[in-house]
Amino acid sequence: ILPTYNSAYTNDDLMALYSYTGGVAEYVEMMMDAGATTKEQMTERFIAKNSYFIYEGKNMLIEEFGKDYARYFEILQLIASGYTTRGEIESIMKIELSGYLTKLENDYSLISRYIPMFQKTNRNIRYQIEDNFLRVWFRYIYKYGYMIEVGANKKLKMVMDKSYTTYTGKVLERYFIAKMIESEEYTQIASWWDRKGENEIDIIAADELEQKVIFYEVKRQAKDINLGILKDKAEHFFQATGKFKKFDIGYQGLSMEDM
């Protein structure tokens, strides 16, 4: 739909549309109808004083969570801000969270737990918000709601611009994983990281029937992709898991240019 409204759109514009709307048709139409067809315009529209998006996250969830909504909102805000392990979240909130995390995952289907590919234990778990819109809403609107209350929307945009590159890098990974699942070309798709977090592989996609596996590095800009480092990380993966050593192995970079 973006080319219809902006024939000169860039990959960054497309990335922004996906990040802010999650591809939800209603949200996409709101952006287009408001004339927000570039990354800058979309950011401004997302946090505008009369923006529908400012209240949407709260309207979606506050009744569902009931009286405990503030605690659930804080957990989701921390996950959206990059605190993705139970230990990290508990150290900030100073409470035991297993019950809340279980409900967010199983009852509300708002978060999912991820473990490194082929890990057999429940250690090294990371949590993610599944809905792209809610992820960005908690990351910026809820977290910095106090800025919106005093009309400091321009200041909030500065905050968003500062962290936008890092934030959308993770969104880009999710985009490519979703596309790979849609392609039905692979029997296994996952990420991998070691216990210390020193070696991390963005995407591993394998076809067990064809005995093929591709290790992917995802970067916003193609110039930042380093396949040499990716191969080194794959060696750590082989040593840690013992998997895919006899497969036909490939290494590939993905960037916004591949969207």
Task: Annotate each language-model stretch with its function.
Residues 117, 124-259:
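A cross-kingdom feature that marks ATP-driven nucleic-acid transaction machinery
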Residues 1-139:
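Interdomain hinge/linker elements that couple catalytic modules in large macromolecular machines
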